[in-house]
Amino acid sequence: MKYAPLSRDEGRTLVKIARMAIEEHLRGSKNLRLPDDLPDVFRQRRGVFVTLEKKGNLRGCIGYPEPVKPLIDALIEAAISAATGDPRFPPVKPEELDDIDVEVSVLTPPEPLEVESPADYPSLIRVGVDGLIVERGWARGLLLPQVATEWGWDAEEFLCNTCMKAGLPPDCFYDPETRVYRFQAQIFHEDG
């Protein structure tokens, strides 16, 4: 299925809903009131990640790499999980919310990269455009497209770091049992 890009206004709405979901959850409310006029695209199944930063540092990032749920449902669950369920961080406290910036990444479905030789993988990766998933057995790691840019990585460094995110050796992509996928993301921030 081909996915049309979201508009800037739709992206802003997603970011607002993600923040509302976090705020309501931290208040103990189970009744998140969504606008009645949500765009139809919010009901399409899409992959989505919600990233939280506090004063420029990662504070939580959780999402759905695959389009398994309607975007609005996946967004709300990812937002709450990023704030309360990322095992790398303690749960966000209500008093932290003013210092938290919310970012929403809406993903295209991951596509497997087919190569003659594993050494060819880096040539198929567009840093700053593609996100990566590396998978071998039960191990799976994902890095969003913006991560490589933020860290100044080239394509091979991005691939190695995605391997390590999966808990695998950095050169695991040379193993024929390893699968590499790429995807793209539209990234929306609270500041526009």
From Swiss-Prot:
Pfam families per record: AMMECR1
Disulfide bonds: none
Domain AMMECR1 as annotated: residue spans: 9-192
The name this protein goes by in its record: Protein MTH_857
Source species: Methanothermobacter thermautotrophicus (strain ATCC 29096 / DSM 1053 / JCM 10044 / NBRC 100330 / Delta H)
Taxonomic path: Archaea, Methanobacteriati, Methanobacteriota, Methanomada group, Methanobacteria
UniProt cross-references to SUPFAM superfamilies, sorted A to Z: AMMECR1-like
InterPro entries noted in UniProt: AMMECR1, AMMECR1_dom_sf, AMMECR1_domain, AMMECR1_N, AmmeMemoSam_A, Uncharacterised_MJ0810
